[in-house]
A protein has these predicted regions:
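N-terminal leader/targeting and assembly helices and adjacent pre-domain segments
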Residues: 1-192, 283-323
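Acidic, glycine-rich two-metal-ion catalytic cores of nucleic acid-processing enzymes
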Residues: 191, 196-292
Length: 323
């Protein structure tokens, strides 16, 4: 394999991964903004409700099953209702916002995959494919449809634990809320809340969203290969220090495209391993064209085109680039 061909592939893959990362960052930032807005409003309400509790009600709250059916005092019932509203809003609103960006990604990746693999006659509807993708498990059984419902349920349990624990330790309402929201500190010239439960949850949301978007991209590629007539796929792992041992060990493995035992990437959070269509021996005949950029050709500066547009050997792999 010639060095120019290897470099062309690596540059092309790097450009596309950089684009996907930027697109995912935009989606993540929009979701985190919504997450912060909803959570801050509900925490303010929770703080007000905690201030209204009597000593007897605080003691009752310490041993409360928040999801229980039993009736409590009016003020405790208001706290339960406030938590219901908080986490229902997170589940519904974040899911809706993510779906919009995921459909946009699916449409883009469908067009990109056709262009990348030179299958001009293949037509994949990204929007239609997403309806199947959202109900297809990935990363050990996660479903896109349940992504934010699961995140909200997990966070709710943590918040309930902090309320109980804080009261049992004699913490003030302000201290309890601070454990959830964090402490306001100066960060990078501005102010932000750090060290709280919500900061940790932002990292969870970012990781889960990036993984879900990877699931969308990989699924679209598989649909494209099937439509193009490929019967086999080959594992393509990004081989660097961040690649897990499992993905590195199966790089280059070949599977029937319809094999139910075939790994469904992403198999773990932040997984960058995917598939390429091939024959039963793992080869893709001839040359394949690539235009590895979201911009139109006319909008790409001439000095960048040599890395983004051209022809390369269809059998060049990421693994071979290490040779």
């Amino acid at each position: 394999m010639s060095t120019p061909a290897q470099k062309a592939l690596l540059d092309a893959l790097s450009q596309h991964q950089a684009y996907l990362y930027r697109a995912s960052s935009q989606s993540v930032n929009e979701l985190l903004k919504q997450f912060g807005s909803i959570s801050n409003a509900q925490l303010l309400r929770l703080s007000e409700l905690l201030e209204e509790l009597t000593d007897t009600e605080r003691k009752a709250l310490q041993g409360l099953n928040f999801s229980g059916k039993g009736r409590a005092s009016k003020r405790i019932e208001e706290i339960k209702a406030s938590l219901n509203e908080w986490f229902d809003s997170l589940s519904v609103e974040l899911s809706a916002d993510f779906e919009k960006s995921a459909i946009t990604l699916a449409v883009y990746e469908a067009a990109y995959a056709v262009k990348l693999f030179g299958e001009a006659a293949v037509a994949i509807s990204g929007a239609e494919a997403y309806e199947t993708i959202r109900k297809t498990p990935y990363a050990g059984g996660q479903l896109v449809d349940h992504l934010f419902k699961d995140i909200a349920a997990s966070l709710r349990k943590k918040v309930e634990y902090v309320i109980r624990d804080g009261i049992s330790q004699g913490q003030t309402n302000q201290q309890i809320v601070q454990r959830i929201k964090g402490k306001r500190e100066k960060v990078d010239g501005g102010y932000s809340y750090t060290g709280g439960m919500l900061e940790a949850e932002r990292h969870v949301i970012e990781r889960q969203v990036r993984t879900a978007r990877s699931h969308v991209s990989t699924s679209i590629y598989i649909d494209t290969y099937k439509a193009a007539g490929y019967e086999y796929v080959k594992v393509v792992a990004t081989l660097d220090g961040r690649t897990c041992k499992y993905c590195a060990s199966i790089d280059g493995d070949i599977y029937s495209i319809d094999d139910p035992a075939r790994p469904r990437f992403p198999v773990h959070p932040n997984n960058r391993t995917t598939y390429v269509g091939c024959d039963k021996d793992g080869n893709i005949a001839g040359q394949r064209p690539f235009v590895m950029d979201e911009r139109k050709v006319k909008d790409i500066p001439k000095e960048e085109r040599k890395h983004l547009i051209g022809q390369l050997d269809a059998n060049t792999s990421v693994g071979e680039s290490k040779v």
